[in-house]
């Protein structure tokens, strides 16, 4: 037998073995990735309350917690990042947790049920709400319903760039089309949503690179991102929300609105005026601004320094810390 043929056969055998092992490895990784993807999607079919671990806050405030209500198209991961960015301010008054909306759609009853379970399991007695963008609407309704249905009084609600009406949202054309499709039962497929996400980021490119635009578009289409159904249901919720239902239903909750005059998503003057008009008896502050935050709409995850400075001025009005008592000789603190 020709030695060259033998060498070629040996090389082919070695290559085939490597190719086989490589194929098995790739298949295993793909199967594992598909399993993880399905598991993530399965878990996100229910509404949950997610904690952000902070042992110091848990020790200091065992029965008090902030609850974040995330904004439009905000994923569970980004909600946790928001809380981590605000930890310096919020953790001085309570533990930290966020609502994770179900990918099957926004459901206030489910949010209430998840919150009741969380309160019972953690033995919480004091609740503070932080409404991120449209999450301020959700926080307001949840607080009103907790009071009327359970007799639970939410102590504080911070409204971060939150619209108080569909008319406060600047992009009315997209808003109306999404809601109309949702109401007639049409769900937006991923390819259409991907085109919109990309176009939206091109229009609002600002200082982002093209690579960042593509990355952010793909993030919105990953298994970790909110589903198209959830986003459509969030849009419908904003569209249907009526502040007059809750203006007299907040009990003794102390509310505050913060925002940015440069906001290109929600009209700052319109939203501020509406919160003042309908929640005047509860609204403690509405003049603090997140100037310098980028992007200007509800961006604590990107502008933590700005937000913590604003909250450093706001929270003493809403939740004054108890003054230490006692002197050098001892005493309670």
Model regions: which residues?
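Conserved alpha/beta-hydrolase
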Residues: 87-105
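N-terminal secretory signal peptides
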Residues: 1-15
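Gly/Ala-rich beta-loop-alpha elbow adjacent to hydrolase catalytic centers
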Residues: 131-139
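Catalytic active-site module of serine/aspartate enzymes centered on a nucleophile-bearing elbow/loop
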Residues: 287-333
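N-terminal export leaders
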Residues: 15-25
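Short, surface-exposed "cap/lid" segments of acyl-processing enzymes
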Residues: 42-90
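Serine-hydrolase catalytic core
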Residues: 204-286
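Active-site nucleophile loop of the alpha/beta-hydrolase fold
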Residues: 158-169
């Amino acid at each position: 037998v020709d030695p060259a043929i033998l060498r070629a056969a040996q090389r082919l055998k070695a290559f085939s073995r490597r190719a086989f092992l490589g194929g098995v490895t790739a298949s295993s990784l793909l199967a594992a990735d598909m399993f993880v993807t399905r598991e993530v999607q399965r878990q996100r079919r229910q509404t949950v309350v997610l904690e952000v671990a902070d042992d110091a806050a848990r020790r200091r405030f065992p029965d008090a917690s902030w609850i974040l209500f995330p904004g439009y198209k905000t994923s569970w991961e980004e909600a946790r990042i928001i809380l981590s960015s605000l930890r310096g301010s919020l953790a001085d008054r309570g533990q930290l947790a966020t609502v994770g909306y179900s990918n099957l759609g926004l459901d206030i009853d489910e949010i209430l049920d998840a919150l009741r379970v969380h309160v019972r399991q953690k033995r919480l007695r004091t609740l503070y709400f932080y409404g991120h963008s449209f999450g301020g609407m959700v926080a307001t309704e949840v607080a009103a319903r907790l009071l009327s249905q359970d007799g639970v009084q939410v102590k504080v609600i911070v409204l971060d760039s939150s619209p108080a009406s569909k008319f406060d949202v600047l992009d009315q054309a997209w808003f109306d089309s999404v809601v109309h499709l949702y109401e007639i039962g049409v769900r937006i497929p991923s390819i259409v949503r991907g085109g919109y996400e990309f176009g939206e980021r091109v229009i609002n490119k600002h200082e982002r690179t093209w690579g960042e635009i593509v990355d952010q578009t793909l993030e919105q289409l990953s298994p970790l991102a909110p589903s198209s159904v959830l986003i459509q249901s969030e849009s419908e919720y904003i569209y249907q929300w009526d502040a007059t239902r809750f203006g007299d239903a907040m009990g003794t909750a102390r509310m505050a609105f913060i925002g940015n005059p440069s906001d290109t998503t929600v009209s700052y003057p319109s939203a501020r005026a509406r919160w003042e008009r309908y929640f005047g008896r509860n609204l403690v502050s509405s003049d603090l601004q997140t100037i310098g935050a980028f992007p200007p709409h509800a961006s604590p995850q990107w502008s933590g320094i700005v937000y913590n400075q604003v909250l450093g001025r706001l929270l003493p009005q809403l939740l004054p810390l108890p003054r230490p008592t006692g002197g050098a000789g001892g005493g309670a603190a």
